[in-house]
Amino acid sequence: AGFAGDDAPRAVFPSIVGRPRHTGVMVGMGQKDAYVGDEAQSKRGILTLKYPIEHGIVSNWDDMEKIWHHTFYNELRVAPEEHPVLLTEAPLNPKANREKMTQIMFETFNTPAMYVAIQAVLSLYASGRTTGIVLDSGDGVSHTVPIYEGYALPHAILRLDLAGRDLTDHLMKILTERGYSFTTTAEREIVRDVKEKLSYIALDYEQEIETAKTSSSVEKSYELPDGQVIPIGAERFRCPEVLFQPSMIGMEAAGIHETTYNSIMKCDVDIRKDLYGNIVLSGGTTMFPGIADRMSKEITALAPSSMKIKVVAPPERKYSVWIGGSILASLSTFQQ
């Protein structure tokens, strides 16, 4: 969250609401019945953490309202009734979701004006393009959205319910198989941190597995909050490999490379060349080192042999949806 015209968000925190697992015994400590974002994160040992957004769609409106309240009053420290608001949503979101969002903004927060933009379109804005296909992969959902001259092509948008949270779950499972126990909502956050700090995507998965067996070049170590150090080896690339092989976690879906290709194939034959040449990655789950090269390799294998393929992975892609929103909301034409 932040202000239009800024080049980076002022506040970045996880969409989590945490409630105490135990009853407070210390009188006068000012214990809250709910914690949001980083505060929930830091007290996670005594809380049950809930994510009000599932697969990019809000499933718990009371908690979502808490998060927005926290954003306005504690993070940005603004009065929402004094500022127009730009919110974003996943493509192909149910219409009722957007209506509920609008209702809360106007009725609970009294915002003077609001607009709901599609996330992937904003990422393309941020990359300075008007044509391209965006693969946007966050915590709960991934999408491929082809955009031509600024228009999203709804018939070719594909959605993949596979994203960061699934990778964290997969890593939890791999580590459990190795004898480490991560079960609570708080421990899941530790695993997420392992994933974000150490994972990478192999250019050739089979070959990387062989390398990991014979050499220790892949091994890194991670220190848990209690001081215990665990070695992380092949898990580093086994975890995000799921993006290219969803069957590893029992999903029948196509991987992100194939989904991108399928999305392009649903577009008019005349514009495919422009899409192949502008494949833009966005969202936190595209932050793995090696993802652009692997994506490029996989799509080259699927596309016609003469096709020029370019995968763009802007360094700020974790926040490119926000940056695109900042650009859009500061245009004078938009404000009218």
Curated annotation (Swiss-Prot):
EC number, as in UniProt: 3.6.4.-
GO CC list: actin cytoskeleton; cytoplasm
Keyword DNA damage recorded: no
Gene Ontology MF annotations: ATP binding; hydrolase activity
Main localization (coarse): cytoplasm
Job description of the protein: Actins are highly conserved proteins that are involved in various types of cell motility and are ubiquitously expressed in all eukaryotic cells. Essential component of cell cytoskeleton; plays an important role in cytoplasmic streaming, cell shape determination, cell division, organelle movement and extension growth.
Miscellaneous comment: There are at least 13 actin genes in potato.
UniProt record similarity statement: Belongs to the actin family.
Protein's name in the database: Actin-79
